[in-house]
Regions:
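Flavin (FAD/FMN)-binding glycine-rich loop and adjacent Rossmann-like elements that form
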Residues: 1-125, 129, 133-150
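Surface-exposed loop and adjacent secondary-structure segments within mature catalytic domains
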Residues: 155, 160
């Protein structure tokens, strides 16, 4: 939710981090009475630290659907999804979902009953970052999600958009 993005709530079962500012592109453009083109519906909220995304966000309730993981169509408010929608976040959540699926198969349980401690242990052993321990520079409050995506070679990509360039 927006509360998680802005740090007023913390996920107690994280499977990855996101960090992009919450944004939503304009709904339409119109010409105002003075003849100026204006955007309507722009949303831009930033200035928060990287935040954890809950396992519960990628797993539908058992009474709704069994054994489905949704790392892209996850449960989030439309404002929070403006932050989560970045490809590096989807890649992290996809990896976490695959790890959870493997655990569910190995333990013969539905994904809703995967042992969270075992899942977190495996994600950490795979070098998944589940908790942000770094600091946010005051001149660059919107850290790019790509900084949180680490591969075995530690190669990362940085977007200029997040820094406002």
């Amino acid at each position: 939710t927006q509360h998680h993005c802005q740090g007023s709530r913390k996920a107690d079962d994280p499977v990855g981090l996101a960090a992009y500012g919450m944004d939503s592109h304009n709904v339409q453009r119109y010409v105002d009475p003075n003849g100026h083109v204006r955007n309507e519906g722009d949303v831009e909220v930033g200035g928060f630290s990287p935040y954890p995304i809950s396992y519960r966000a990628i797993v539908p309730r058992a009474n709704e659907c069994a054994n489905l993981l949704v790392p892209v169509c996850l449960s989030a408010s439309h404002i929070a999804y403006g932050s989560i929608r970045m490809e590096p976040v989807f890649m992290v959540l996809g990896q976490s979902a695959a790890t959870a699926a493997a655990h569910a198969i190995d333990e013969s349980v539905p994904v809703q009953r995967v042992d969270g401690d075992k899942l977190h242990q495996r994600l950490r052993s795979d070098q998944q970052i589940l908790k942000w321990t770094g600091q946010v520079r005051s001149d660059q409050p919107n850290l790019d999600s790509a900084r949180l995506l680490r591969t075995r070679s530690d190669h990362i990509g940085i977007s200029n958009h997040a820094a406002g360039r």
